[in-house]
Swiss-Prot record:
The modification N6-(pyridoxal phosphate)lysine is found at residue 221. Belongs to the class-IV pyridoxal-phosphate-dependent aminotransferase family. Expressed in muscles. The lineage of its organism: Eukaryota, Metazoa, Chordata, Craniata, Vertebrata. Its cofactor is pyridoxal 5'-phosphate. This is Branched-chain-amino-acid aminotransferase, cytosolic. It catalyses: L-leucine + 2-oxoglutarate = 4-methyl-2-oxopentanoate + L-glutamate; L-isoleucine + 2-oxoglutarate = (S)-3-methyl-2-oxopentanoate + L-glutamate; L-valine + 2-oxoglutarate = 3-methyl-2-oxobutanoate + L-glutamate. GO terms for molecular function: L-isoleucine-2-oxoglutarate transaminase activity; L-leucine-2-oxoglutarate transaminase activity; L-valine-2-oxoglutarate transaminase activity.
Length: 385
């Protein structure tokens, strides 16, 4: 890899030029309002990620000048050189968080600092420039305030926030980019799955496909992790399943579910009531909902909570011995999603999630959405407007 261009942490411009700006600041925001505002959709008709608000946030960066002033402007197409590194070598990353209109009509963000932390880590892994996480979050809040009427007046819908960071240097060399663009777009959304917000999903598990591997970027939110998963997702659908259960290694370790983290609520091998999820070992995305569920379960203190490896043999044995209570995915888009079946080695494994309530998954969903929609006060939220 050619790392001669821009790999120094102390890049400077041409001799005699001023020092590059190390970060953008929210106080420098330049806001240009849209002159024509679009009609707001009925929240009950929303299809995930297909409708966008009136405005967007953009911030440009170059090695020579550093960060330019952040701008909020009418939503518009990007103008990129066809040689931009994001288009050829996937020098990019994204984030996903939501704004919720509470029962008190206040607009809240849910644990956005965790998203900013993860975005920063992804940027470092992608060799994209550093930024001030607090300043970016403040810029995002200003964008949400401007488009606050797009936050659905509904407790079954929300405003999805998509920060994105891409390399824009017009060069076909495989190297760290000397130009980049950070932008944020907003989209009002309903349930992520067409089956509904809390209907169980079926999974397809086949070890011939791998989502991530040790030493890779599976713990970063990069588009390449998702684009490369689509072929397996299509095969899952062909096998009448809704999502892929990603396996890893010779022991077929259970890792993630589609775009979600995975939880298993069961009686473990030692006869203990346990909520288990795979550990953050570099192939698991450190999800905000994952962390929130672990935090809640630890606080409740009612059963063992573990970050541990789980294999398909562990699961099939537990199902045969009637030790599995619930299995569910978690993520910003879906919050909590029950699992009903797994197609593995041409056999369907029935997971009794719905037969068991699902008491725990329902309790977690209720607790998290109570916080998100302001039915319960919590320091996990930031009030925007």
């Amino acid at each position: 890899m050619d790392c001669n261009n821009g790999c120094s942490a102390e890049g400077t411009g041409e001799g005699g030029s001023k020092e590059p700006v190390e970060t953008f600041k929210a106080e420098d925001l330049i806001i240009t309002r849209a002159t024509i505002l679009k009609e707001k959709p009925d929240p009950s008709t929303l299809v995930f990620g297909t409708v966008f608000t009136d405005h967007m946030l953009t911030v440009e960066w170059s090695l020579e000048l550093g960060w330019e002033k952040p701008r909020i402007k009418p939503l518009q197409n990007l103008s990129l050189h066809p040689g931009s590194s994001a288009l050829h070598y996937a020098v990019e990353l994204f984030e996903g968080l939501k704004a919720f209109r509470g029962v008190d009509n206040k607009i809240r963000l849910f644990r956005p600092n965790l998203n900013m932390d993860r975005m920063y880590r992804s940027a470092m892994r992608a060799t994209l420039p550093a930024f001030d996480k607090k300043e970016l979050l403040e810029c995002i809040q200003q964008l949400v305030k401007l488009d606050e009427e797009w936050v659905p007046y509904s407790t079954s819908a929300s405003l999805y926030i998509r920060p994105t960071f891409i390399g824009t240097e017009p060069s076909l060399g495989v190297k760290k980019p000397t130009k980049a663009l950070l932008f944020v777009i907003l989209s009002p959304v309903g349930p992520y799955f067409s089956s509904g917000s809390f209907n169980p999903v079926s999974l397809w598990a086949n070890p011939k496909y791998v989502r991530a591997w040790k030493g890779g970027t599976g713990d970063c939110k990069m588009g390449g992790n998702y684009g490369s998963s689509l072929f397996a997702q299509c095969e899952a659908v062909e096998n009448a399943c809704q999502q892929v259960l990603w396996l890893y290694g010779e022991e077929n370790q259970i890792t993630e579910v589609g775009t979600m983290n995975l939880f298993l609520y069961w009686i473990n091998e030692d006869g203990e009531e346990e909520l288990a999820t795979p550990p953050l070992d570099g192939i698991i995305l450190p999800g905000v909902m994952r962390q929130s569920i672990l935090d809640l379960a630890h606080k409740w203190g009612e059963f063992k909570v573990s970050e541990r490896y789980l294999t398909m043999d562990d699961l099939t044995t537990a199902v045969e011995e009637n030790r599995v209570r619930e299995m569910f995915g978690s993520g910003t888009a879906c919050v909590v999603c029950p699992v009903s079946t797994i197609l593995y080695k041409d056999e369907t494994i029935h997971i009794p999630t719905m037969e068991n309530g699902p008491k725990l998954a329902s309790r977690i969903l209720e607790k998290l959405t109570d916080i998100q929609y302001g039915r319960e006060e919590s320091d996990w939220t930031i009030t925007v407007a």
